């Protein structure tokens, strides 16, 4: 393993490690079990190398891989919580770290499965469960998440939220995390190289627009079809990149994160305090600012009427291009 970034836990804040996990080639349940043991081994070895480590993050699909022929089968799906998260919890407790893990989750109601992330604390408790709000359609078959965007307490005064891969391309997702109090947004991804530039750009913009840190990590390596770019990235709350990984599988990207500085910016900044200014427009001219919503898309989305002007001309609206059956439209 190589590494980029910091080595030592700061006096305030916390030390994080983003693992550029090699893209798993998974053909059977035995392969999944092998990945789980490899992830657990990585937790312990990384903690040994970085004794001050408090938060370790693994990418999307690091547990079950991206075998599109099998990824929705009973053999491949997991329950959350379940035996797999119990094993991760034991490892986090033994190494005294917070851990972020990716699980393709069996739908407990019997419907389509979810793409899920969990955070487990150093006591081995699952403190956050998130289901991907925006699956990467039309490639992914996952059901859109139904748990909102939860926030939990983390190390060093942090308030943590997690988004998954394509979620980070929507500024609304990062804004929702910040609006609910997150000062650190974690993004776990399984992107191939086609969107690496856009991935890095949105990691920075999500940080800047919301005055919060972003910790982002992607799978790395070649699976026989695509190359996954790794490039773990830690962005400061001002949108600058603090640490940037390379395209190496097994690279460990570490950084010192100071959530208190993001909190201070949110309280003390005037110019560019945009997470506040969005709801207090023009407060110099209008005491307290204008509160009314001026945005048509926000109103329409809230009313279930979101529709772009060119919607009737859009060519791809189902998963048939990737072999998924066309399902009847359901209007909620």
Curated annotation (Swiss-Prot):
Its EC number is 3.5.1.49. It comes from the Bacteria. The keyword Magnesium does not apply. This is Formamidase. The keyword Ribosomal protein does not apply. GO terms for molecular function: formamidase activity; N-carbamoylputrescine amidase activity. Is an aliphatic amidase with a restricted substrate specificity, as it only hydrolyzes formamide. Residues 14-259 form the CN hydrolase domain. Keywords: Hydrolase. It catalyses: formamide + H2O = formate + NH4(+). One of its GO terms (biological process) is putrescine biosynthetic process from arginine. It is an enzyme of class 3 (hydrolase). Belongs to the carbon-nitrogen hydrolase superfamily. Aliphatic amidase family. The active site is at residues 60, 132, 165.
